[in-house]
Amino acid sequence: MSSTLREASKDTLQAKDKTYHYYSLPLAAKSLGDIARLPKSLKVLLENLLRWQDGESVTDEDIQALAGWLKNAHADREIAWRPARVLMQDFTGVPAVVDLAAMREAVKRLGGDTSKVNPLSPVDLVIDHSVTVDHFGDDDAFEENVRLEMERNHERYMFLKWGKQAFSRFSVVPPGTGICHQVNLEYLGKAIWSELQDGEWIAYPDSLVGTDSHTTMINGLG
């Protein structure tokens, strides 16, 4: 197998007046063999390894092991998967933002650059777990429930507002917008993402890790 499998699988796609680069599984199959029968979820992971292959965190052997999964349907190593994004809800997401803030404080004490402490992947935090229903059955119920929610959790929301401004790749979906499952499916998720890297637009499939057991699985492949 070529030691430059990442480059060997790189292809281009023209969309209107923009050129996108992506990592083609059919091109990779010329070196890896038949991968057509891999589960779709593993194909997404395989593209991820091709895109991030650097010879250290992702090696030829890592890619070959995943491509050959059908031989025994068993993994003999960890998969160095980098998710396209992270989805949090407020119950588990707030402590993570507190940790990031604490890390920045530690870096500041040591004389370092606090702006370097940021999420490596884009993070969306959806505020939905603390919303309660005090009013119902009338036209003003929604607005009144949101107002009470903001009053009861004012300090939390001020902290999250600071986090949204302080950290790059971090956004907050305010209360009253909807639950994580709905917001993820209808607003946040995309089939394909694109990102400018070293002067090139790279297109890649959506993938997601979340902070609870089920939120991220809606409409998922596996």
Locate the predicted segments by residue.
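Fe-S-dependent hydro-lyases/dehydratases of central metabolism
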Residues: M1-G222
